UniProtKB/Swiss-Prot annotation:
Residues 113-185 bind DNA. Residues 203-452 form the NR LBD domain. Heterodimer of USP and ECR. Only the heterodimer is capable of high-affinity binding to ecdysone. Residues 185-192 are annotated as: Hinge. SMART domains: HOLI, ZnF_C4. Keywords: DNA-binding, Metal-binding, Nucleus, Receptor, Transcription, Transcription regulation, Zinc, Zinc-finger. This is Protein ultraspiracle homolog. Residues 26-51 are annotated as: Disordered. Signal peptide: none annotated. Composed of three domains: a modulating N-terminal domain, a DNA-binding domain and a C-terminal ligand-binding domain. The gene is USP.
Amino acid sequence: MSSVAKKDKRTMSVTALINRAWPLTPAPHQQQSMPSSQPSNFLQPLATPSTTPSVELDIQWLNIEPGFMSPMSPPEMKPDTAMLDGLRDDSTPPPAFKNYPPNHPLSGSKHLCSICGDRASGKHYGVYSCEGCKGFFKRTVRKDLTYACREDRNCIIDKRQRNRCQYCRYQKCLACGMKREAVQEERQRAARGTEDAHPSSSVQELSIERLLEIESLVADPPEEFQFLRVGPESGVPAKYRAPVSSLCQIGNKQIAALVVWARDIPHFGQLELEDQILLIKNSWNELLLFAIAWRSMEYLTDERENVDSRSTAPPQLMCLMPGMTLHRNSALQAGVGQIFDRVLSELSLKMRTLRMDQAEYVALKAIILLNPDVKGLKNKPEVVVLREKMFSCLDEYVRRSRCAEEGRFAALLLRLPALRSISLKCFEHLYFFHLVADTSIASYIHDALRNHAPSIDTSIL
């Protein structure tokens, strides 16, 4: 009984703390005046993985890795899948550069994915494969999807380029021995096992497991907004306009992908359309910055993690999108050094110190999106229920997987006020330099929710 009381007290106190430290995003007219004497040529809100953007970048300002236009695996820490009820395997591809931490369930894995060469999470449909390729093959078979190759049907499929050509990826799955009938048999077994089961409530369907599935399956949208742009009235100096314009185009694509991700969250699409628009409108900047901070953990060197060092240099690289980084010197010259340092020091470094994993990351993303304090919501109680469900899921996951770390649940949530503060500073740059189109972002979100491709049917996974 005492343990239950302790849990409730901790959850409520942290929730109240977050709510008090979570001001609403000010209206654009309140963000116009930012004292600054330095020009800015860098846009922060670039985040979710995407396929090759059709833009040309000014590489003088960016550090481009080989094949940077190809998606890479998510960074670093993965969820302790043994602690997730109903989820036996890791739900996202392994990290791009780092090994698993010693306590990770897959740290001793000796197998690589037969399709892309990433770390395999087990044998799926007859072949050792990662969760990314497993999910791709399962979705292709169950939806009976067909693909076309834009090249010569011999595209390279590795962990950085596996999303570039779906046709060649599927053909390689078959060539490596993945069996279509195994997917169909799995679905039949699942159907038999649920014949006598009671239908779950809407709240029960929202879980970390489902969010992990969405994170690994969400596709790149076919088009992007034209929300961020360098117009004739922009205050960006002429010599910086080309790289800023390129980054704006990439940023627009990332915002479009974010809308697709949000729409696929269980029951988000059942909210009033106006509520969906308001929730995305008030969280997109935070979500994109959070994704940048998450990916940038890979680029933090070991020297900066040495607590005994007294002359530790600040982090030098920020990952804007898979394979594309921005150096601190470029950020300083562009006039956004403060935002650069805050994202890495207040978010990335703290997240790495906490050893935040993928399950915690996706849960926090949903918590950021499902903010019942947004003004104008038509069905606030339903948003409250969904967000409280995510609080409970995260708290339960932390207690099971990190039971020895007292206060971890609070430590995770306390990254959110810092994220909100940084996002407001980023907004100041966007509006001060007139990088936001005159039309409200709500119209772009509305079009994306109404016109983009059908969402992922996770109920059949």
